[in-house]
């Protein structure tokens, strides 16, 4: 949990959420662009307080070396003072969010949300910039999404769905919902 410790005492936090895109230029000057779906879509830059002395924090810093870049680590913004990065902006309650399900028809840069709450069709399920999670991976909503009259809604996100869904998955939006990590542990 060393990343969590560093996050909780950080002076600043930076998030790089850019897609991994490459461009090539052919001999006739035609530009070709392609996107690679990455497993590690977000890069975090945490600047800990200046008083984080190595001599006093060897255990925390050593626990960062063990997973390094090879193993998955999780950070929970909701349990620190940095929840403003992921704060949900829509009109659903936490219970309504937990009852919604991401559908198997989700693909590419459109996630499909079902089991919608009974709220007015003009109410916002998501606002542009909201963080949502499907399975293990997080996505950023790119446009406002209203409830509408249909049983499902399309939620446009900033990058393509990494793992296709084989069954419905509970919705996680902003600081609300239950996340299941690779080890099967849950946290909110």
PLM ranges: what are they?
Residues 1-188:
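Extracellular/virion structural assembly segments
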């Amino acid at each position: 949990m060393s990343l969590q410790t560093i996050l909780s005492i950080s002076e600043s936090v930076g998030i790089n959420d850019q897609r991994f895109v490459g461009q090539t230029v052919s001999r006739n000057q035609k530009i070709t662009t392609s996107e690679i779906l990455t497993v590690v879509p977000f890069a975090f830059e945490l600047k800990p307080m200046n008083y984080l002395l190595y001599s006093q924090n060897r255990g925390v810093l050593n626990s960062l070396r063990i997973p390094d870049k090879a193993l998955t680590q999780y950070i929970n913004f909701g349990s620190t003072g940095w929840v403003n990065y992921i704060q949900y902006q829509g009109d659903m309650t936490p219970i309504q969010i937990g009852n919604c399900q991401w559908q198997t028809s989700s693909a590419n840069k459109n996630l499909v949300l079902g089991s919608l709450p009974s709220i007015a069709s003009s109410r916002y399920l998501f606002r542009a910039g909201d963080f949502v999670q499907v399975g293990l991976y997080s996505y950023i909503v790119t446009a406002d999404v209203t409830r509408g009259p249909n049983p499902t809604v399309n939620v446009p996100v900033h990058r393509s769905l990494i793992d296709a869904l084989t069954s419905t998955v509970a919705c996680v939006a902003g600081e609300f919902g239950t996340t299941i990590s690779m080890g099967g542990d849950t946290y909110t």
